[in-house]
Regions:
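N-terminal secretory signal peptides
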Residues: 1-41, 51-58
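Glycine-rich FAD pyrophosphate-binding loop
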Residues: 109-127
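Conserved redox-cofactor binding core of oxidoreductases
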Residues: 176-272, 292-293, 463-482
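N-terminal Rossmann-like FAD-binding beta1-loop-alpha1 element of flavoenzymes
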Residues: 90-115
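Core beta-strand elements of the Rossmann-like FAD/NAD(P) dinucleotide-binding domain
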Residues: 86-88, 271-280
């Protein structure tokens, strides 16, 4: 059924369904009889009811008449604008790494007129805030810089699939792994980029050693190797898009899409204007990072991060593309979050020195192998906190005096800039406590001194034996045996949520029945199906932004 046409009829139908969902129509047989007469199957009815309930809960406008921006230009009987304020081949919604890549790819693949609409005052998004790490196997840089000559897309795929814990679509992961080497070469050629370093991530407890390689490439400006990071990508990509004739509008929020009588996406509503897209619309508007309502309903870890931790992504990441897509029947999936311990950069890559510590819960017990890729042990921290304290639960990083002389990446080390001041500030605000004995530390934390001492004794014995029999840790088997002792109430830094609209290998956004929504494409973390319940290591999201943005732009340009 056409989603847009006949707004009055749509509003009436949505109102009726909501009334039914609220129990105002009590006789299920009467309800099913009525919808059967309208040609709807029970399966589609139930799917629609679930969608209506979810969208209503998330504050979506799927059951309203056309939004304010649509009404501004007037609509005809089909629900389409009476006139368009601009006409393009491809419209890209979102000007971060994936969106700019999609725009360039569309132009490169034959689209003559491409428009990028960015909600913020400038392009870049969270990509511009990122370290600039991109994963790939078998590249010239991996061979030349890291000396890795035995990697392959197959090993890379198996690495990603293992960390996904079975909660991804294998064809999407395979697509990313196979395309990754060429994507990096294309990125370098298209955006004046090189890669100045290649390093690796840490494993998870169930990862096979044979799947591990140094694959993380650091984005660097080919004209100035002092410039690194995601901002190099977005800056250079924006320039490349504009040089190819692409148009970019900032301070422009996309609020809806238009579909014709066949369900084909034909344009977007943005601000008070409506723009026609003859070939396709690409959603690259990130995930639900700062949308508390959607996180509450779909992503428990992201909600916890918003309420109690620190979310460091672009504030414009409010799931706009996901909300709009769901309102038009798109399928979705939500899993977890991308968290790290920024104060120590713990286990973010295998070139960083690590400080001696263990993680403990509110009872003083270890609960995870600490030397795992950062989002894995951060997920365990979330689970441990929730298990013992709910939304107000917490975990602790337990250290001894060696922390004060650790590497400068530790925020409280004397070797860090203002490290001693940072340590004193943490002690003053109570986020860190210090004591000369473990029993004294436990008392300050409100936990059993006997239990905490037993935990540390067991850890120290494992260090002496050279084997962590409890969890299998291999890095920094260093005893905590020198007073004073410190416990820091951990605070995760969130650099993104995991969840979005389901796509296929052509970056087409799928509806709840698994069918592509015609002329609607997705890139980056606006999409889902290629990331599992936690982040499998630096460079995965940027490869996802690159891969799906590149494919989405090309697919849209090729649309008929």
């Amino acid at each position: 059924m056409n989603i847009i046409a006949g707004r009055l009829r749509e509003t009436a139908e949505c109102s009726q369904r909501i009334n039914q969902a609220e129990g105002l129509v009590r006789d299920e047989e009467d309800v099913m009889s009525a919808i059967t007469e309208q040609g709807m199957s029970r399966r589609n009815f139930l799917a629609g009811m679930a969608g209506v309930a979810g969208l209503a809960a998330a504050g979506l406008a799927g059951c309203s008449s056309a939004g304010g921006s649509k009404e501004a230009s007037g609509s005809d009987a089909s629900g389409l604008p009476e006139k368009w304020d601009g006409e393009y081949d491809v419209i890209v919604c979102g000007g971060g790494g994936s969106g700019l890549t999609a725009a360039y790819s569309a132009l490169e693949n034959g689209a003559e007129k491409v428009l990028v609409l960015e909600k913020a005052a400038a392009c870049g998004g969270t990509t511009a805030l990122a370290e600039g790490a991109v994963q790939a196997s078998g590249t010239q840089w991996q061979k030349e810089i890291a000396g890795v000559t035995d990697d392959s897309a197959e090993l890379h795929k198996k690495f990603w699939l293992t960390d996904a814990e079975g909660i991804v679509k294998e064809d999407l992961v395979e697509c990313m792994a196979k395309n990754a080497p060429d994507n990096l070469k294309w990125m370098a050629d298209s955006f004046n980029i090189t890669f100045s370093n290649v390093f690796g991530c840490y494993p998870t407890p169930y990862m096979k050693d044979e799947y591990m390689r140094d694959r993380i490439h650091l984005i660097t400006d080919a004209s100035d190797e002092t410039k690194t990071g995601g901002v190099v990508w977005t800056t250079n990509a924006q320039k490349a898009v504009e040089e190819k004739g692409g148009e970019i509008q900032t301070n422009t929020e996309v609020t809806d899409i238009y579909q014709d009588e066949t369900g084909t996406v034909v344009g977007v509503a943005a601000g008070k204007k409506n723009y026609k897209a003859n070939k396709g619309v690409v959603f690259a508007m990130a995930s639900i990072d700062h949308n508390e309502e959607m996180a509450f309903r779909y992503d428990q870890q992201q909600y916890w991060d918003l309420k109690t931790q620190f979310v460091a992504t672009a504030e414009t990441n409010t799931g706009d593309g996901i909300r709009i897509g769901m309102a038009h029947g798109a399928d979705s999936a939500f899993h977890g979050a991308v968290d790290l311990i920024l104060q120590t950069w713990s286990y973010t890559n295998n070139q960083n020195p690590e400080i001696p510590y263990i993680l403990i819960d509110q009872r003083g017990n270890r609960f995870v192998r600490e030397d795992t890729t950062y989002a894995f042990h951060c997920r365990a921290m979330f689970n441990a906190a929730m298990a013992q304290g709910g939304i107000d639960g917490c975990t602790y990083m337990l250290m001894d005096s060696k922390m004060t002389t650790a590497d400068a990446k530790c925020a409280w080390s004397d070797n860090a800039k203002d490290g001693a001041k940072a340590r004193e500030a943490a002690l003053a605000d109570g986020s860190m406590v210090q004591a000369d004995t473990l029993e004294g530390l436990a008392e300050k934390l409100g936990m059993s001194g006997t239990n905490l001492k037993a935990t540390v004794d067991a850890w120290n014995a494992a260090c002496a034996a050279g084997e962590d029999a409890a969890y299998g840790r291999k890095v920094q088997l260093t005893a905590l045996d020198t007073a004073p002792y410190y416990a820091w109430k951990t605070q995760n830094t969130n650099i993104g949520s995991i969840g979005g609209l389901i796509i296929d290998t052509d970056a087409r956004i799928l509806d709840v029945d698994g069918n592509p929504i015609p002329h609607l494409y997705g890139g980056g973390v606006n999409t889902a199906g290629w990331l599992g319940p936690y982040y499998p290591g630096s460079g995965t999201c940027l490869q996802g932004a690159l891969n799906w943005g590149r494919i989405a732009g090309a697919s849209a340009a090729a649309s008929k």
